[in-house]
């Protein structure tokens, strides 16, 4: 069961539960008469409140407003990957071709396959790279460590309004995404109180049907949906497998 995986459970505690706390705070403020001119303005305000809640104080989460496209997410991921595998790379940075090998490995056919990879070998998720320089052979790079979640050398970043789509797929901007070591693992869809949380759930389903969760977003493990007053979460699944009863 994906939801019982230690990694996912910790994300639930650090992401979804903090999201609920932030959204409850925002709800309390709105109950005292705060209004916005449009639904989209309200939703952006909710996003800002959530990001502030996740990153305030001594939180491990870092807000990265510069990461606003899939290309930038990949660049950030490879930066983390090289930082975490200095000894294995032995002063030979990844080439363009080698990065494409890794991108192909991380373009999962569904979220369940991503979950199996994240479970890893002895709790470590790795990618294999055939070095372009044949004399360097084949190496395995560590991406995620289950025993390092919530500490250690893992990095925790928050991004929002990342542009997805292109090449025949409608372009959209996601609400809030949580990254671990550069990989998107939790997608949060937010609606204002004039909508139900099911509107956010349907938006997630629509994005999947449109093909928004491909490439680097195919590693997602949890969806969080909220309309400020109600927040629910569910293990990531393809649109035809998402069941609202499990929210």
Residue ranges of model-derived segments:
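An alpha-helical interface "stripe"
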Residues: 2-247
């Amino acid at each position: 069961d994906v939801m019982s995986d230690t990694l996912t459970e910790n994300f639930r505690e650090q992401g979804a539960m903090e999201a609920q706390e932030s959204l409850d705070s925002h709800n309390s403020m709105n109950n005292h008469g705060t209004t916005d001119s449009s639904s989209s303005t309200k939703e952006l305000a909710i996003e800002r409140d959530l990001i502030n809640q996740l990153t305030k104080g001594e939180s491990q989460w870092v807000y990265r407003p510069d990461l606003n496209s899939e290309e930038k997410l990949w660049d950030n991921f490879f930066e983390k990957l090289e930082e975490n595998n200095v000894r294995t790379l032995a002063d030979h940075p990844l080439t363009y071709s080698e990065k494409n090998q890794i991108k192909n490995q991380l373009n999962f056919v569904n979220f369940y396959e991503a979950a199996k990879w994240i479970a890893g070998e002895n709790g470590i998720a790795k990618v294999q790279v055939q070095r372009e320089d044949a004399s360097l052979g084949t190496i395995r790079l560590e991406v995620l460590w289950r025993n390092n979640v919530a500490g250690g050398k893992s990095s925790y970043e928050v991004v929002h309004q990342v542009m997805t789509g292109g090449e025949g797929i409608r372009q959209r901007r996601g609400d809030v995404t949580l990254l671990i070591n550069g990989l998107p693992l939790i997608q949060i869809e937010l609606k204002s109180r004039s909508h139900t949380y099911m509107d956010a759930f349907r938006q997630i389903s629509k994005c999947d049907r449109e093909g928004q969760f491909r490439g680097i977003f195919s590693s997602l493990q949890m969806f969080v949906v909220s309309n400020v007053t109600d927040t629910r979460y569910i293990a990531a699944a393809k649109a035809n497998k998402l069941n609202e009863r499990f929210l």
